[in-house]
């Protein structure tokens, strides 16, 4: 089993802070995102590798286990001490697609619920829903003398992408060997709760907490979204239109003359759905770019501009 250096994958040191790791992930995820590299298999593999590294290093427990055991190339029997991880821990990636190193280290799948979530007992321990009817006393099984099963509510998390949360999505989860369909409403926010009444073991409820995954393109703050766009230096100086990616597609942003890097501009009504109706705004950070390579004509023009400013 080949050792995976997750710090090297993200280009950070082993002493990197949480914010350093998050920043490195966002930068690389944006660079290798499938939407920007359609049909590029190497970029897709890199994107998956970045996701695997971030899934480990962004979680304190995973990172501690990785730092303790990963560098030795020897994984303790059964994976890291404490067992597998619950759903919601893998940053939106399917852990079954991660490397053999990850599978050996962390066990890959979450217990209980297939797909993108995991069910837990009320005290937070991962549980297998099949065990709820297996004689676990207050956690399930048959009541003594009556032969009646206890009603058991189960809780879990369901991960959805930012786009799915915005548009709404149809999901299928596995509960106690049954496939249940549910609808995540459009405009759902992180932490929202969905209840499937009577669908749990013994006629209990299934309670789902929605986890909206981070998106390399957008940041959500209340009703507003924030993104960034590259603006060529001449456009920043003279003004002009640039294409901005929105959560529903793309739009045109008119950049005023004399704009500097870091300036925030607003596209009204292009943000998140409001509970009261309508949508918030999309804020766009301008990233003024300078070409690394110049044609002879461009070089001459830049030299003339430089000379004028002396």
UniProtKB/Swiss-Prot annotation:
Record's keyword terms, sorted: Chaperone, Cytoplasm, DNA replication, Repeat, Stress response
Keyword S-adenosyl-L-methionine assigned: no
GO cellular component: cytoplasm
Protein role: Participates actively in the response to hyperosmotic and heat shock by preventing the aggregation of stress-denatured proteins and by disaggregating proteins, also in an autonomous, DnaK-independent fashion. Unfolded proteins bind initially to DnaJ; upon interaction with the DnaJ-bound protein, DnaK hydrolyzes its bound ATP, resulting in the formation of a stable complex. GrpE releases ADP from DnaK; ATP binding to DnaK triggers the release of the substrate protein, thus completing the reaction cycle.
Oligomer and partners: Homodimer.
Domain J, chain residue ranges per copy: 5-70
Top-level taxonomic group: Bacteria
Main location class: cytoplasm
Recorded family membership: Belongs to the DnaJ family.
SMART domains xref list: DnaJ
Any one biological process term the GO annotation gives: chaperone cofactor-dependent protein refolding
Protein's name according to its UniProt entry: Chaperone protein DnaJ
Region Disordered, annotated ranges: 257-276
GO molecular function: unfolded protein binding
Annotated CDD domains: DnaJ, DnaJ_C
Keyword Glycoprotein: no
Compartment(s) of residence: Cytoplasm
PANTHER family per record: DNAJ HOMOLOG 1, MITOCHONDRIAL-RELATED (PTHR43096:SF52)
